[in-house]
């Protein structure tokens, strides 16, 4: 009987023994199930590691899917809806474009792309956000807190080899009017000329789409070295 009561107490006492930042033993064991319980991991992530305790169901899966990315958005902003489209093509610069050359001949029968760039649809996804909450909408803009937190969570969830194109859709009537002394307006994002005037009648369901940039795990880091000794062969 005492053993059963002890098991019940151990099962339901976790909220009482929870420590700030998930530093208690139970939280560390749960974080260890998703690979975040290694000592020193919290210092490598620019967000409280305890946030991932709410994402155990998606983080423990061996694959990364659209439901997991939507869970990240819901955790940060409950009033924001997310739509994930996999295999979103992106332009990739070709290191050696096809050309008429005897040194590096190419064959069009092998599907060789023409031009200086090609399209890659294997390592990038499209994340479309939509919200009618003005507070959350301001937080999603580049440089604000929600945008920064999303990039950090995507780095932990997606890793380094996948990129994501981020876009935000808002109702036009929720944007601030571009007047002096009014709300803050970002040119190219939330600044719409003529908004609020009688000449422009905005529909209830009219929206505007804003590009929020791109999440990229790995960035190119070329190293240019000065050549000191050159041998010319004529």
Regions found by a protein language model. Name each.
Residues 1-5:
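Long, hydrophobic/aromatic-enriched structural stretches that serve as scaffold segments
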Residues 6-76, 80-103:
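Feature for intrinsically disordered/low-complexity regulatory segments and propeptides
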Residues 71, 75-234:
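C-terminal structured domains
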């Amino acid at each position: 009987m005492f053993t059963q009561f002890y098991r019940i107490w151990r099962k339901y006492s976790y909220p009482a023994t929870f420590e700030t930042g998930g530093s208690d033993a139970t939280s560390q064991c749960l974080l260890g199930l998703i690979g975040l319980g290694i000592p020193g991991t919290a210092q490598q992530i620019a967000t409280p590691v305890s946030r991932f305790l709410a994402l155990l169901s998606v983080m423990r899966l061996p694959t990364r899917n659209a439901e997991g990315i939507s869970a990240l958005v819901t955790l940060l902003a409950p009033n924001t809806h997310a739509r994930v489209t996999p295999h979103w093509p992106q332009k990739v610069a070709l290191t050696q474009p096809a050309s008429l050359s005897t040194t590096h001949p190419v064959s069009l029968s092998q599907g060789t792309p023409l031009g200086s760039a090609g399209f890659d649809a294997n390592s990038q996804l499209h994340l479309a956000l939509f919200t009618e909450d003005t507070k959350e909408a301001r937080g999603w803009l580049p440089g604000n807190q929600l945008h920064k937190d999303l990039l950090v969570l995507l780095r932990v969830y997606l890793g380094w080899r996948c990129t994501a194109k981020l876009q935000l859709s808002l109702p036009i009537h929720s944007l601030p009017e571009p007047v002096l002394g009014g709300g803050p307006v970002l040119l190219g994002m939330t600044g719409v000329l003529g908004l609020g005037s009688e000449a422009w009648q905005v529909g209830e369901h009219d929206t505007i789409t804003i590009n929020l940039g791109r999440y990229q795990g790995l960035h190119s880091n070329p190293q240019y070295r000065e050549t000191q000794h050159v041998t010319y062969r004529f």
